[in-house]
């Protein structure tokens, strides 16, 4: 008999600031690796169409985001890090249930995310360029750092 949580959570895709079902409308069920009868939750079974929608929404949002002053972007990223810190224990427990990772290692993974968010927030205050002398008397070379655009990554998070 499958054991479910008091309330099985159904997770949707966050695209364009809205929680939406997958293009197919299908979901899949995730089970605890420690107990295959324990349901972790139900998740949107996404496809290439969903990925394209997400990338397009991110590209559209980037046009506004890139105009936000770097120190303000830094504050937003710092708040994200502080939220991770506030919910560290529950996030670590969720990771343990979902992946079978030992709790102390999951706590370490969440701490790495917290540390990276705080680091990135600090970098928001260092969005400056540099100038260097040029070969000609009345000229100089200038480099300015600026956001490039949407980046998609797939990271491994399997365990052990």
Where are these regions (language model features)?
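Glycine-rich loop-to-alpha-helix module at the N-terminal edge of alpha/beta enzyme cores
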Residues: 36-128, 138
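Short glycine- and Lys/Arg-enriched binding-loop motifs that mark or flank ligand-binding interfaces
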Residues: 13, 21, 96, 118, ...
